[in-house]
Amino acid sequence: MENSVLQESEPLSCVEDNKSLGNTVLEETGAEILVAQIRLNIQHPNHKEVIIVVEGEDDEKALKKFFNVQAVEFYCTGNCLKVKNVMQIVSTDKQLKYCVIGIKDADFDHINKISHNIANLMITDAHDMETMMLTPNVCRKICLETINKEYPKLSIEAMLSLKNISYLRYYNDKIILKRGSYKDGISFQGIDIAQVASNSQPINVQSVLLYVKGKGNSNKTSFPDLNTMNLFIQQNPIDDGDLILFTNGHDLVYAIRNILHSIAPQEARKYSDKNIATMIRICYAKEEFEKTDLYKSIDNWNNNRFKLWAV
């Protein structure tokens, strides 16, 4: 491409994102403390009209360009549970419910058919921000930038290759963490996606379990054995059309990088996972965002009260 998307700059952010590849065990929240901090913010004489609470830096980077920065400021909490708990308080607060909203990754909410019914809480249309933004148009631009040709199967191949590691993440969320056993949750710290996903084909379940168990999970009695995992997969079938609801965006970025490197080792090698993540955010257009349920939810909440959107 004549003008590389990587030449564009990105907005600064408030905190370091802790939603790294390895972050799965959610910490206890101090929602009341965060709400108190937000209340102090809006009492400042130079405060913005609307505060948008998000999980971390990547979410702010992805969303900021769509909003009127004169009217909106972002507040980063660190994880999705904090966003939800803060919004539970905000939605019943006579002052804050009119000027504060939270945006969280859906994670497995769509797969589990979970509706939070919290007025000020909005969720992504897909599993998370990256999967929502990785539209066919965005994939096309990434391919033209990195390998200088179109590769329409990029996204689906990457998601299919991740299916078994995605199932393990789903087991962690649906079985282990839902019991409230956060300390027993599976750690995905230090996972090399190349060890659990091979381009368009998933690594077999047994190999995924052995590899992840060796990454700090050897002594966890909650870690599933092969029979348990196979039964879980059988009982929770995921159609290919639902993979955008099922696939972790950080995993997806790594898998896309690996596929691009395999297609064009010379041309694509200079593009890292961070470069790919940046391209997803930059290439995702306002016109595509305006078609999402996330946009419509925010716009309905606003109800023309504030000049919320960037022109």
Regions found by a protein language model. Give the residues of each.
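Acidic, divalent-metal-binding catalytic cores of TOPRIM
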Residues: 2-311
